[in-house]
Amino acid sequence: GIQVDADAKSGTATILVKQKTGERAVFFERATATEPEFLEAHKQLIESAYILHINGRHRQLMRSAMAVAKEVGTIISLDGGAQRYDEDMKAITEDSHIVIVARDYAEKYTGTTNLEDACRIIHERGALIAGVTDGANGSYFVWTDGTSYRCEPFSQATVVDTTGAGDSFHGAFLYMLTKTLCKIADGTNTSTMNETSLSLNAIDLLHSCEHEDLEKAATFASAVAALNTQGIGGRSPLPSLEDIKALIG
């Protein structure tokens, strides 16, 4: 459930959008609430999940959640947004299994402006799947076996608002990845199941993903992010599956 601090204020973001380009500036007022408490209910959710998705906020709580995920084999997915990297995030990034970050984060974390090299460095530092997003220029990936992939962008004639493009990219990628993990898991739940397949956790399943499935997830995410720029706000322009499929073709 939601933890409520009755005497505190929630964080508030004011977003200004440039009408001609859809570029935005964010002014953020931090919450005055105390750090959320890590509860037994959180632990149980993580233990039953394929993926724990984090973004670097509420770090004490996040580290507790990551510890549980590592213990039970739940995949840790990190969204490294622009202007969000600091030295404290280095260890968190290295401890995450899926690391998909914005260009700004990647450059600060790796020390290079070459995004293909940055993606490779992220992978070499521990990420099973490494990704760097670069807005209208597309994205770069390195899969679990070290194979590189360049995901082309879906260019739009006009961009209304880029708010939420990164969040929608992450959500869409993990949506498609989870579908693949479920499909692989269902394949083990057959009459041929043995002791090895019984012990498979989410990280084991991630290693079993085919390149084609991962590329489809990246393409799907790119399409969702592109369509999400066609309206004001981060949520209201989220597209339907029909619109996504129509764009991908």
Where do the language-model regions lie?
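Beta-strand->loop->alpha-helix junctions that form or flank phosphate-binding loops
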Residues: 1-10, 81, 121, 131-134
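Acidic, amphipathic alpha-helical patches
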Residues: 41-42, 89, 118, 159
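Conserved phosphate-binding/catalytic region of the ribokinase-like
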Residues: 114-249
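Short gly/ser/thr-rich secondary-structure transition/capping motifs
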Residues: 31-37, 78-84, 112, 205-207
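Conserved beta-alpha-beta core of the PfkB/ribokinase-like small-molecule kinase fold
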Residues: 50-120, 137-139
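Conserved N-terminal subdomain of the carbohydrate kinase-like
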Residues: 1-50, 245-249
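Structured loop/turn residues at beta-strand edges in well-structured enzyme cores
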Residues: 44-47, 87, 94, 125, ...
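Proline-centered loop/turn at the N-terminus of a beta-strand
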Residues: 13, 75, 98, 128-129
